[in-house]
Amino acid sequence: MTSLVSRESFSLENYHKVAWLGESVEISDSAIAKIDGARSGFLSLLESDDDIVIYGVTSGYGQNAYQRFDKEQRQAHAGKVSFATSAAFGDPAPERLVRGIVFARLVNFIEGHAAVSSDLVGRVAAMLDEDRLPPVPTRGIGCAGEIQPLGHLFNHLSQERVMGVKENLALVNGSPCASALAADVALSARRRLDLAYRFFALSIEALRAPLEACDPSLDLLWTAPEELRALQQLRDLTLGGDPDRRSFQAPVSWRIVPRVLAQAEHTVGRLESVAESSLSSITDNPVYIPPDADNPLGRVFSTGGYHNGLAYPAIDGATASWADLATLGDRQITKLLDSKVSHLPDQLLAKEDGYIGVAGMAAVAYQEEARRAAQVTLLPGSEGGGFGQNDIGAPTFWSFNQYGTAGRALDAVLAYLGVTASQALHVTDRSAPPALIEFLEAIRSMVPPVTDSRALGPEVEILAEQISKAVVSASSTADLEVL
C-alpha cells in the first residue's frame, strides 16, 4: 500500500505502483488533518463575505459564470450532477490508465488546495480498491480542461453522497488526466525504447556492421548524455559478437542508430520529467490557498490549471521518435534482404522456396502508419462545442491516441526487423552476441527461421503483440517471453 502524505508522494514511481501494479493508497493522518483544516478555513472564508465571488461555488459554471447564488442557492447548486459532460464514447482507456487518473486526482486534495472534505478524499482513494472502475473513453474528448473524462469517472460519487460546496467541481477540474497520460506514456516509452535497443543491436550483428559507429572514442567527442547512453547501451549489447565485420562502412541507417536512439532517449527523458512535475502539481480551479499573515482565512482564485500545456507536446515527441525508429527499421529490413548491400545470401534464402522478401512490403506500410500518427498535436482550430468561456479544448487525449497508433506500428516494424535479423544469422550459421542470445531465442520461439515458404504474417503478428504487451507489463523491465 502506498502512503500519501503530501505532494511529494505523487511521483512517477508511486504512479507505477498504484496504476500499473494495482497497489491501494492510504491517506496519512497528517494529510487528513491538513485536508480538514483547509475545508474548515474555506467554509469560514465563504461565510465571511456575502459578496465573495468563487467560480462554481457562488457562481454558475462555464457560460453561466456571471450568475450569482445566495447561500441557499449555493447548496442546491453544489448537489447538482453534471451528467451532460458524459458525452464522449469510443476506445475505453485501459484499466491501468483509469487507476492512474484516480491516483493523480488525489494530488489536488492532499494538502487541502481543493478545499474538499476528507470524507470525499477517502471515497476517491477507495476507488483504487475496486475490481473495476467506470469506463473512460479516450475518443471524443474535445472539452476545455478535462470535465468530460472526469465526469465519466467520478459522477457516480456525486450520486452516492451529499456533496458540499465546491466538491463536485473539485472532482472534475484540474488536469489529472494529462498527468496520468504523460505518466503512462513515459512508463511505456521507456520500456519500448529498451526493446528497440535490442532489436537494432541484433540488426547490427546480422549485417556484421562495423562497430565504429559505437566506438568508445566517441564518448570524448559527443557531449549529450543521451548520446553517451545510447553508445554504451549498443556497445554492451553487441559485445562478444562476430569478430569478422564488414571491412567498409554500413549504410546510413545503421551508422546513425546511436544518434536516433539518443533522440528517443531525449524525448523519453523529457516525458519522464513532465510526468514527474505534472503528477505533483496542484491544478485545481478555483484553487484554495491556506491562511497566511495577509489572508487569515486563506484565499480562492481561478486558474488555468486544468490545461496542461507540457504533456501533449512531450507525448508528441515520443510519437515522432517512434516514427523515426520505424523508418530506420524499414530501411534496415530492405537492406538486409538485398545482397548487393548486405553481402549476405540474397533475400536471405535458406532454400529456393524460403522467400521472406515481402516482409519489406509489410514493414513500409507499418512505418507509414507511424509517420502519419506523428502529426503534431496543436490546440484545436475551432471553438467547436465551446460555449462562452470554454473556447479552447485540451488536446492531450488526441496526442495519447496518436502515440498508441505509432507505438503499435513501431512494434510491427521491430518484429519484422527481429525476424529478418534472425533469418540473416540463420542462413550464415552465426549466433547472437551473448547479451542477445535469450532475446533471439524468444524471437525464434514465435517466428522460427524460414526454411520453407510459409505465411509469416500470423507469426510476426504474435511477436508484435508480445512487444506491445511487454511495454505495458507490470515488470520493471520489458522482456520478450519465450512462447
Please give the residue ranges for each predicted region.
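Acidic, glycine-rich active-site loops and adjacent beta-strand->loop/helix elements
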Residues: 61, 107-108, 128, 142, ...
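Alpha-helical scaffold/interaction cores of sigma-54-like transcription cofactors
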Residues: 1-48, 66, 78-136, 141-142
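Metabolite-binding pocket within alpha/beta catalytic cores that recognizes anionic/polar moieties
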Residues: 51-53
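FAD-binding core of FAD-dependent oxidoreductases
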Residues: 55-109, 135-157, 163-180, 311, ...
